[in-house]
């Protein structure tokens, strides 16, 4: 195993273990040796997806609350906020992608694994409500380990609240596009990740419910090598397309053109 750190000037690739200089990862954060894709921060994802200067955050005041009195939860939250510069695991706003307007929500797995809680739920609800109010397509980029255990049933209720709001969105002509990135697991994959009119999986993404290790500890089965991969889901008809990271922006832009909602609603 490499002695190189997980971050810094030189970094060990999590997949192949080779030593990669930060410049070698490139704009799209891909290992030059094994082509492993690094997980992106929200800032990196926005930089790659939206037209320069077009992203305008929605006004959101929701903050996480320790309703269950879970030990050390608030300390973990503050630590995640310091490390990421975010106040929660999703950022939502209006944006242009290839000059096409949309409402965009981007989850960040660096913030407590992008887990779904009451604050993230309210932000996603607000994003969908704004899509309906402004008559814009909604794009959700998922990157999550599932529901946040520190908020227990309150986090699980969020799954149904989001599904109910997306049902209201589905009753309009407005499209929902979901982009499943690594990881998309647990309660997020079990709820809204697969509700898109168009479901795109980023190449190399791990997508599923329970992890492979948990499944193998529970059931005496040998899982296939491509288990819970974007390619496997595409092969089985669970996603509409698998797209390499450098092509995501143009793919989304073309999809928005094809739907023709944003420009027709906004001139």
UniProtKB/Swiss-Prot annotation:
- Report TM segments: none
- Residue positions annotated to bind Zn(2+) are 13, 16, 31, 34
Question: Quick check: keyword Endoplasmic reticulum in the entry?
Answer: no
State the InterPro entries in the record: AcCoA_carboxyl_beta (IPR034733), Acetyl_CoA_COase_Trfase_b_su (IPR000438), ClpP/crotonase-like_dom_sf (IPR029045), COA_CT_N (IPR011762)
Reactions catalysed according to its record: N(6)-carboxybiotinyl-L-lysyl-[protein] + acetyl-CoA = N(6)-biotinyl-L-lysyl-[protein] + malonyl-CoA
Q: Which family does it belong to?
A: Belongs to the AccD/PCCB family.
Summary of the function given for this chain in its UniProt record: Component of the acetyl coenzyme A carboxylase (ACC) complex. Biotin carboxylase (BC) catalyzes the carboxylation of biotin on its carrier protein (BCCP) and then the CO(2) group is transferred by the transcarboxylase to acetyl-CoA to form malonyl-CoA.
Q: What name has this protein been given in UniProt?
A: Acetyl-coenzyme A carboxylase carboxyl transferase subunit beta 1
| The species this protein was found in | Lactiplantibacillus plantarum (strain ATCC BAA-793 / NCIMB 8826 / WCFS1)
